[in-house]
């Protein structure tokens, strides 16, 4: 008698947590794109899967995944640093590196114009590849005419991620029965907005913890001097921390769109600066979405409805002769607290 194995898949752009600080610093030195945190373009898995226990076969997949690669969500994420550089250029206080940076950001802005936060072609391809890997690795789940039930948040990049993945699954097996939906009706668990927990993320204690870390670990003056020739202009006109974070976001997002083939902004930064900014991003995510004491330690419970849904739908599907798969397409801001809630 064969036993059944349930697979719970939580997919995100996360790197192994056991990686030591020094080894990861070396990896960033070798490949700057790894510093991009949640903007890291989803890397194609290359490891070998752990085989199921003897006598077990996979019969059901329950999945919550982030959308694929996207453009930055807001126009000001491009315009805010660009306008600062343009103002400096207009009065002649930019270095040659600063002038190069203006030209690059203008190209990025043009590529993303009116596509703020939308899925890129790379993002669509990522979900097609995920579908192919799932089908190849778990044929017992997707055999014959089983049901695949898919839900997305109402955000277009998530909907298109879902559609690209489902279309590829159907290409692999035209007999699959697929149903999909993206509705405000399901947002209570697909992307819960808990006002009380949201306020706890923005307390003075959280802000002070972030500011204290920044003061101890960050020094952006050398970077600023590579872009501007006049320190008084910088002091009077620039919020240096925000400006550098904007540049770091732009540098990280490049790898997610087609413009990655023709430009990079990582030449602005030293490897040590990239490592420090990567660390800062980790601190920010921990303070806002994990069980940090500064936020009351309750942020993982923002995904309580999603976890309940995963459990109840698994119970329901496993009562069927052929359970199939339940696929959910959402955001990284759900995945981190969900992972913490699952311990």
Outline where the language-model segments fall.
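Signature for phosphate-centric chemistry
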Residues: 22-147, 153-325, 330-343
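Bacterial Sec-dependent N-terminal signal peptides
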Residues: 1-24
């Amino acid at each position: 008698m064969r036993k059944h194995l349930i697979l719970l898949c939580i997919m995100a752009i996360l790197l192994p947590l056991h990686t030591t600080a020094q080894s990861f610093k070396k990896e960033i030195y070798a490949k700057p794109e790894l510093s991009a945190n949640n903007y890291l373009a989803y890397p194609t898995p290359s490891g070998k899967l752990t085989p199921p226990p003897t006598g077990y076969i996979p019969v059901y997949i329950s999945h919550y995944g982030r959308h694929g690669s996207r453009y930055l969500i807001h126009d000001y994420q491009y315009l805010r640093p660009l306008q600062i550089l343009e103002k400096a250029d207009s009065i002649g206080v930019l270095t040659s590196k600063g002038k190069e940076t203006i030209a690059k950001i203008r190209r990025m802005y043009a590529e993303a114009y009116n596509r703020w936060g939308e899925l890129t072609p790379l993002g669509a391809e990522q979900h097609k590849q995920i579908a192919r890997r799932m089908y190849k690795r778990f044929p017992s789940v997707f055999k014959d005419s089983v049901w695949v039930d898919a839900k997305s948040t109402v955000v277009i990049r998530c909907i298109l991620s879902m559609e690209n993945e489902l279309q590829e699954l159907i290409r692999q097996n035209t007999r699959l029965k697929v149903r999909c939906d993206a509705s405000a009706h399901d947002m209570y668990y697909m992307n819960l907005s808990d006002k009380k927990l949201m306020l706890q993320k923005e307390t003075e204690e959280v802000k002070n913890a972030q500011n204290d870390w920044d003061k101890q670990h960050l020094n952006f003056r050398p970077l600023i001097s590579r872009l501007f020739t006049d320190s008084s202009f910088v002091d009077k006109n620039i919020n240096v921390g925000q400006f550098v974070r904007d540049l770091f976001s732009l540098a990280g997002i490049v790898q997610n769109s087609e413009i990655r083939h023709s430009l990079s902004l990582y030449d602005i930064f030293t490897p040590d600066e990239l490592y420090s900014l990567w660390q800062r991003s980790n601190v920010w995510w921990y303070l806002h979405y994990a069980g940090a004491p500064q936020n009351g330690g309750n942020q993982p419970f923002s995904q309580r409805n999603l976890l309940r849904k995963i459990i109840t739908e698994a119970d329901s599907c496993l009562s069927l002769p052929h359970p199939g798969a339940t696929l959910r397409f959402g955001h990284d801001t759900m995945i981190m607290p969900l992972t913490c809630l699952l311990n």
